Each structure stands twice: as structure tokens, then as C-alpha cells.
From Swiss-Prot:
GO cellular component terms attached to this protein's record: cytoplasm; membrane; microtubule cytoskeleton; spindle
Keywords attached to this entry: Acetylation, Coiled coil, Cytoplasm, Cytoskeleton, Phosphoprotein
Subcellular localization: Cytoplasm, Cytoskeleton, Spindle
Function (record text): Promotes the assembly and stability of microtubules.
Protein name: MAP7 domain-containing protein 3
Superkingdom in the source lineage: Eukaryota
Ranges annotated as biased composition (Basic residues): 831-842
Composition-biased stretches (Basic and acidic residues): 214-244, 425-438, 465-475, 613-639, 680-697, 861-876
Length: 876
């Protein structure tokens, strides 16, 4: 371009080229400066985070691509940095929020854990308190039970002391008294244990401990009892040496009889029969050693005699004793029951006694008491004695006498005083249940009596010891235990008292042997006999009879026969009393002389006491039950009261709700009932309003018709007045006006029909051209206003004169409904059109008839006075 310009400048003016070159250079400099300024501004905007807008170069030059790319890259990086910063801030905000939420959750969890721990602690404390209260209540209960049991034991001890003091004898020495006290203490302990077993609940640990204490006390008392029995045996020994031998004297025999007990109940038996089992256990523990070590008895006598004796015993007692019970049977019953009863209570001891008595009785009874034996017991001597006397040599019989006397003497002494034995019986024998006595006593007696009797025989005559006693005891035990079980299970135990003649008649062999031993034997065996008597526990004679009165009658008959022997009874009673004292001290009882009446009195007293105690227990139980029932009833009443209050509250609420619902329903029903009434009223009102509107429309239409008729009359009058002499002009005007009038009248009639059709569509449907009868009279129709219209000559303007009111009812006529105005507007529109057409026709007529212009003008004025009036009135 520079070259072209220079070439052109060479041919033209050089000043223009220079100017052009200068201008280009100046523009380039300006562009460079602007570029530099843009770069500086961009750096400044980057530093201040302000975007710089691109300013185009004035001279049209463009930036380079690398600069553009660099700027775009910088913008992108800046944008990315901003986005990263925003993201980082958002992340930090999220982390902060999550941290706060986590801390809040941890605090909530810690709070819940703390609350749970507090609740558990409170629950644990409440449970501990409840358990403590329960333990306290249980402790109080058990202490009360123990207090009651101790009180009962104290009362029983007092009663026992009073009872033992009734028949105490003055001949007992201090040692027997101490022994009696100790034996009574053991009985009290055992009674306490039995009372605890009966009365106290077995589930308590304190009671078990008390029972264990009682057992230890019982063992201790049993050892004391054995020591006392040893001391007492020494006193027996001394007294037996001092006393003379009394032979041929009969004693009172206490028969320990089993009779079916009808009056006693199971509660009485259970209450009475516990202590016996406990009393018979201690001897068993001590005596188990002796039978196998020391038992040695006469060989043939002990082996051969028992079978027959046992057979006779059980046959007679079980089969013949109870049913017959006559006078003739009394000897047999007594003789047979003597060994049998001891078999029932202590089988082995009874076999020893029966053997020795049957072996020893024939010779001694014949030698000592010939009269008594011949008169009373021929059968016994025949049945029992022959084989025994033949088989038993004199040495054996003499050596066996100590053993016989060991068992026979205490029997006689025990049987003689009924009172003491009756007192022993209620405590020791009557209170024992059949099974317990059957199971416990045989073992105890088997292990106790052989020891004592055989110790006596060892000390008295050591040569007479035999080696067959264990075998015999085992055989007898095996043979007798089942029979004893059968008999004792079917009968309960009671006491039967017989007189001394019956003893003399029925039981001659043991008594006679006893007395003969006391006479003939040296004094050495007798102390042993008296020594062994205390430890032979319960050698009472037991006999299963059902009719006690018959046996008593038999005893009375025997009494009459044996009056000669009755003189010696006092001595025998004294001797037997002493024996009884010593034996009862070993058997844990005290002595006393009593008859059958006293024994029955004591028995009745004991039964009465047991009954009273049972009644007291029953009353206590009933009282506790009543208290429990009262507490339960009170709780039930409280629950029912609470429940009744809640139910009443609920019933009140339900009643209130029901009343509210009923009220609401009543309101709704009233509204429902009033709604159709209101609807009916609204319909009636609407119908009335519609009727009013219709009447108003009819009245207005009648007024319009009346006004039209009046206008027609007026037009006719005007036409008559305005007629002139010019006939032609009048004819033309008349024809034109008549045509116009007819057209206007036709238009008015059409408009009237349209208005009537709009107002009364039912008339059109019925095919009638007019509505029904008008109710409004024509006299009441309002008069419409009239106005005059003048047409000027040169123009077509209409000059209206001021409105004139023939009747001042325009104000009332304007007060119409929207329907009326709309109908009138529809009617007035065609009339205005017709009016314009009429005006054009009149103008033509005026132009044609220039001569009669004035007259035509007046007619047209009169005509125009009618037509626009209708349009105005309808518009109004």
C-alpha cells in the first residue's frame, strides 16, 4: 500500500501520502499503547479478583492466539480455584455439622445410659428393701412360732409335773427322784420335737436347726438315762437283798390290749403317736454290739421250746381270745396272752421270756403253789410243761431262772399297780403309732433285752451260757415280725386292767417262777435281775381283743373264786410298787398307785387335753383364715371401689358424650327439617316475586296499549283539522301520510306482538296471539308524556321543544326492571329505523309538492309528533 501510495503520490499531490502515512503510524502507536494498557489492567484485575472487559482496538487489529489462549487458561484456572475454595468451605461446613451432630448424639446416649443406671439402681434398692422386709416378716413369724411352741412345751411340762405329783410315793429315794427328773426331761424334749413336727411349717431353716438341737439333746439325755438306769439298778440290788422272798402272791396284771379304736380320729392318733418312735431309737444305737458278742443261752431249752409256745400263742390270741371272752376262757387268754403280748411289742424278748417261763414253770409251780396251780392252770402245765421239763435238765432250768426273773419280775411289778402303769402308757405306748412301734420297737427290744438278760445270766451263772441264742433270736424275729405287723396294723392300742385273781389263775408260771427264784436262788442273781429290769423297755402284755368288758367280767368272776388269795395282795402291791418305781425310772416315768377308775380318769383327762389343744389349734387356724379372708375381702373391696369409681367416671363421660351426640343429632335433625321449609319459603318468595314482576309487565303493556289508542285518536283529530281546500294536494298528502301511517301502525303492531311474545311465551305456545285476561283495569293506566318535534325548511335538523308532561308520572315510570328496559330497547330500534325512512319519504313528497308545502309541513309535523314519541318513551 505504501508503494501504491507512493506511486500515486508521484503522479498526484505528495502531501496526502505523507498525511496518510502519518495517520497509519499514529494509529499503530495508539494500538500498541492500548495493548500495553490492557495487559497492565488484566494483571491488576487478577490481583484484585476483578474481571476486565475486553476493549476492541479502534483500528481493527486483533490480539494474537497465544495471548487469547493464555488469558482463557488463566480464566479457567481462576474459576477452578474458586470452585475448589467453595468446595473446601462446603466440606468444612459439613464436617462441622457432622461433628456437632455426633457430639449431640453422644451426649444423648450418655444421658440415657445415666438414666437407665439410675432406674436400675432404684429398682435394685427397692427389691433389696422388699427382700429385707420379707426377711423381717419371716423372722417375726418364726420367732412367734417358736415362742408359741415353747409356751406349749412349758404348759405341757407343768401339766406333767402336776400329773406325776398326783401318785408320788414316799418310799422313793433321792436317786430315783433325780433319775425320774432326768427321764422326764428327755420325755419333754421328745415331746417338744413331736410338737414342732406337728405344728411348725417344715420349710423353715430355723425349725430344722431346732429339730437338730432337739436330737442332740435327746442323745445326751439318753446317755444320762443309761447312767441313771445303772445307778437305779444298784439301788434295786440293795433293796432286793433287804426284802424277803414272797412266794405264792398274785399281783395285778396290766394287760396291754389292742382294741379297734372307734372314737379317736386320725388327727388325735397323729398328734399322740409321734414321740414313741423317737423314744425307742436311742437304745438301738448302744445295744447293737451285745447280742453277737455275749449271747449264750441254754441250748435245748431255747431251741425246742419256742416253736410250740409261739404256735399256741398266736393261734389262741388271734383266733380265740376276742370273740369268746368268757369265764372259762379267761385262764387261756391270760396264759396265752402273756407271751404273745411281749411278742407283739418286742418279739425276741417275749420269746426269751416265754421259753424260760415255760421251761421253768412246771417244777416250780408244783413245788411252790400246788393249790393255786391245780385249781387254775391245768392246761398250761399240760400244754407247755411236759416237753420243756423233759428236755430241759435241772441245771439248765436253774441257770435259766435268772433270765426268767429278769423279764418276769418287772412284768409282775409293772402289772400290779394299774395307776403307775396307766400313767406310763399314755406317754410311751399310746402315743406310738402302730407302724412306728412295730418297726422301731422290735429292733430296739431285740437288741436291748437280750443284752440285759444275758448279761445277768453271765454274771450269775457263767457256766450256763449257750451259743445258739443268735440263731434263735433271728428265727423268732423272722417268725413273729410279720404276724405282729398284721395284728398291729388292724388294731389300735389301749389298756386293759385285770385283777389279781385273774393273774393268779391265768398267769401262774411267770409269777411263780419269779417268786421261786426270789426264794430258792442265791442273792447274787437277784441284783442282776433288778439291774436288768430298767433297760427292758415296754415289756407290757399286748392282746388283740375287741370286747374289754367281757374280759373284765371274767376277771370279776375269777375274783370271787379267789378270795383266799386276796389277803396277800397288799404285800404284793408294796413289793410291786417298789419294782414299778425302779422300772419306771428306767422307762422314763414315775410311780404311783392307782386303780382302773383313776386310770380311766387320767386317760379321759389326757384325751380332753389333747382335744382342747386340737380345738385351740383349730381356732387359731380358723382365726388366721378369717383374718386372711378379711384382708382379701378388704383388698377386693378396695379394688372394686377403685374400679367402681373408674366405671362411674367412664359412665359419666359416656353419658355426657351420648347427650352431646343426641343434642348434635337433634340440631342436625332440626336443620334438616328446617332446610326444606326454608327452601319452600325461598321458592314461595321467588314465585311471589315472579308474579309481581309479571303483574308489573302486564300493567306496563296495558298502559302502552292505552297510550297508543289515545295517540291514534289524537292523530285523527289533527288530520281533520289540518285539511285544506286544495283537494289534490290533500289527496297526495293523505295518500302519502296514509301509507306512512299504515306502515307505522303495522310496525307498532309488530313491535307490540314481539314485546308480548317476549313477555308471555306461554300464549304463543298455546296458539293464541294474545295473553290471558288482564287483571289490571284500564282506568289505573298511567298516561305517557308527549313532545313536539319541528322540522326546519332548509335543513333536515329536527328541532325539539322542551318536554311537556301531561301527567307527572315520569319518575315512577322510569323505575323499571332491567328486563323491561331491554325489551323496550329492542322494540325502539326498529321504530327509529322506520322513522328515518319516513323522514326521507316526506322530504320527497315535499319536493314534489312545492305549492302545498306549508300544509304538508304541518301534517308532517303532526305525524312526527307521534312517531319519535314512542321511541323516546321506550327508551325512557
Amino acid at each position: 500500500m505504501m508503494a501504491d501510495g507512493a506511486a500515486a503520490g508521484a503522479g498526484g499531490s505528495p502531501s496526502l501520502r505523507e498525511l496518510r502515512a502519518r495517520m497509519v503510524a499514529a494509529a499503530n502507536e495508539i494500538a500498541k499503547e492500548r495493548r500495553k494498557q490492557d495487559v497492565v489492567n488484566r494483571v491488576a484485575t487478577h490481583s484484585s479478583n476483578i474481571r476486565s472487559t475486553f476493549k476492541p482496538v479502534i483500528d481493527g487489529s486483533m490480539l494474537k492466539n497465544d495471548i487469547k489462549q493464555r488469558l482463557a487458561r488463566e480464566r479457567r484456572e481462576e474459576k477452578r480455584r474458586q470452585q475448589d475454595a467453595n468446595k473446601e468451605t462446603q466440606l468444612l461446613e459439613k464436617e462441622r455439622k457432622t461433628k456437632l451432630q455426633y457430639e449431640k448424639q453422644m451426649e444423648e446416649r450418655q444421658r440415657k445410659l445415666k438414666e437407665r443406671k439410675e432406674k436400675e439402681e432404684q429398682r435394685r434398692i427397692a427389691a433389696e428393701e422388699k427382700r429385707h422386709q420379707k426377711d423381717e416378716a419371716q423372722k417375726e413369724k418364726f420367732t412367734a412360732i417358736l415362742y408359741r411352741t415353747l409356751e406349749r412345751r412349758r404348759l405341757a411340762d407343768d401339766y406333767q409335773q402336776k400329773r406325776w405329783s398326783w401318785g408320788g410315793s414316799a418310799m422313793a429315794n433321792s436317786e430315783s427322784k433325780t433319775a425320774n427328773k432326768r427321764s422326764a426331761s428327755t420325755e419333754k424334749l421328745e415331746q417338744g420335737t413331736s410338737a414342732l413336727i406337728r405344728q411348725m411349717p417344715l420349710s423353715s431353716a430355723g425349725l430344722q436347726n431346732s429339730v437338730a438341737k432337739r436330737k442332740t439333746d435327746k442323745e445326751r439325755s439318753s446317755s444320762l438315762n443309761r447312767r441313771d438306769s445303772n445307778l437305779h439298778s444298784s439301788t434295786d440290788k440293795e433293796q432286793a437283798e433287804r426284802k424277803p422272798r414272797v412266794t405264792g402272791v398274785t399281783n395285778y396284771v396290766m394287760q396291754y390290749v389292742t382294741v379297734p379304736l372307734r372314737k379317736c380320729t386320725s388327727d388325735e392318733l397323729r398328734a399322740v403317736m409321734f414321740p414313741m418312735s423317737t423314744m425307742k431309737i436311742p437304745p438301738q444305737t448302744k445295744v447293737e454290739e451285745s447280742p453277737l458278742e455275749k449271747v449264750e443261752t441254754p441250748p435245748k431249752a431255747s431251741v425246742d421250746a419256742p416253736p410250740q409256745v409261739n404256735v399256741e400263742v398266736f393261734c389262741n390270741t388271734s383266733m380265740e381270745a376276742s370273740p369268746k371272752a368268757g369265764v372259762g376262757m379267761a385262764p387261756e387268754v391270760s396264759t396265752d396272752s402273756f407271751p404273745v403280748v411281749s411278742v407283739d411289742v418286742s418279739p425276741v424278748v417275749s420269746t426269751y421270756d416265754s421259753e424260760m417261763s415255760m421251761d421253768a414253770s412246771p417244777e416250780l409251780s408244783i413245788e411252790a403253789l400246788p393249790k393255786v396251780d391245780l385249781e387254775t392252770v391245768p392246761k398250761v402245765s399240760i400244754v407247755a410243761s411236759p416237753e420243756a421239763s423233759l428236755e430241759a435238765p435241772p441245771e439248765v432250768s436253774l441257770e435259766a431262772l435268772p433270765e426268767v426273773s429278769v423279764e418276769a419280775a418287772p412284768e409282775g411289778s409293772l402289772e400290779a399297780p394299774p395307776k403307775g402303769s396307766a400313767e406310763v402308757a399314755p406317754k410311751e405306748s399310746v402315743k406310738g403309732s402302730p407302724k412306728e412301734s412295730m418297726e422301731a420297737s422290735p429292733e430296739a427290744m431285740v437288741k436291748a433285752s437280750p443284752k440285759t438278760s444275758l448279761e445277768a445270766s453271765m454274771e450269775a451263772s457263767p457256766k450256763a451260757k449257750a451259743r445258739d441264742a443268735p440263731k434263735k433270736s433271728e428265727m423268732d424275729k423272722q417268725a413273729l415280725i410279720p404276724i405282729a405287723k398284721k395284728r398291729l396294723s388292724s388294731y389300735t392300742e389301749c389298756y386293759k386292767w385285770s385283777s389279781s385273781p385273774e393273774n393268779a389263775c391265768g398267769l401262774p408260771s411267770p409269777i411263780s417262777t419269779n417268786r421261786q427264784i426270789q426264794k430258792n436262788c442265791p442273792p447274787s442273781p437277784l441284783p442282776l435281775i433288778s439291774k436288768q429290769s430298767p433297760q427292758t423297755s415296754f415289756p407290757y402284755k399286748i392282746m388283740p381283743i375287741q370286747h374289754t368288758l367281757s374280759v373284765q367280767s371274767a376277771s370279776s368272776t375269777v375274783k370271787k373264786k379267789k378270795e383266799t388269795v386276796s389277803k396277800t395282795t397288799n404285800r404284793c402291791e408294796a413289793l410291786s410298787q417298789r419294782h414299778m418305781i425302779y422300772e419306771e425310772s428306767g422307762n422314763k416315768s414315775t410311780a404311783g398307785i392307782m386303780n382302773a377308775e383313776a386310770a380311766t380318769k387320767i386317760l379321759t383327762e389326757l384325751r380332753r387335753l389333747a382335744r382342747e389343744q386340737r380345738e385351740k389349734e383349730e381356732e387359731e387356724r380358723q382365726r388366721e383364715e378369717m383374718q386372711q379372708r378379711v384382708i382379701k375381702k378388704s383388698k377386693d373391696m378396695a379394688k372394686e371401689a377403685v374400679g367402681g369409681q373408674a366405671e362411674d367416671h367412664l359412665k359419666l363421660k359416656d353419658g355426657q358424650q351420648q347427650n352431646e351426640t343426641k343434642k348434635k343429632k337433634g340440631w342436625l335433625d332440626q336443620e334438616d327439617q328446617e332446610a326444606p321449609l326454608q327452601k319452600g319459603d325461598a321458592k314461595i318468595k321467588a314465585q311471589e316475586e315472579a308474579d309481581k314482576r309479571k303483574k308489573e309487565h302486564e300493567r306496563i303493556m296495558l298502559q302502552n296499549l292505552q297510550e297508543r289508542l289515545e295517540r291514534k285518536k289524537r292523530i285523527e283529530e289533527i288530520m281533520k283539522r289540518t285539511r285544506k281546500t286544495d283537494v289534490n294536494a290533500s289527496k297526495v298528502t293523505e295518500t302519502s301520510s296514509h301509507d306512512i301511517y299504515e306502515e307505522a301502525e303495522a310496525d307498532n303492531e309488530e313491535s307490540d306482538k314481539d314485546s308480548l311474545n317476549e313477555m308471555f311465551p306461554s300464549a304463543i305456545l298455546n296458539g293464541t296471539g294474545s295473553p290471558t285476561k288482564f287483571k289490571m283495569p284500564f282506568n289505573n293506566a298511567k298516561k305517557m308524556t308527549h313532545k313536539l318535534v319541528f322540522l326546519e325548511d332548509g335543513t333536515s335538523q329536527v328541532r325539539k321543544e322542551p318536554k311537556t308532561y301531561f301527567n307527572g308520572d315520569l319518575k315512577n315510570f322510569r323505575q323499571k326492571s332491567m328486563k323491561d328496559t331491554s325489551i323496550q330497547e329492542v322494540v325502539s330500534r326498529p321504530s327509529s329505523k322506520r322513522m328515518t325512512s319516513h323522514t326521507t319519504k316526506t322530504r320527497k313528497a315535499d319536493e314534489t309538492n312545492t305549492t302545498s308545502r306549508s300544509s304538508a309541513q304541518t301534517k308532517s309535523e303532526g305525524f312526527h309528533d307521534i312517531l319519535p314519541k314512542s321511541s323516546d318513551t321506550f327508551r325512557q
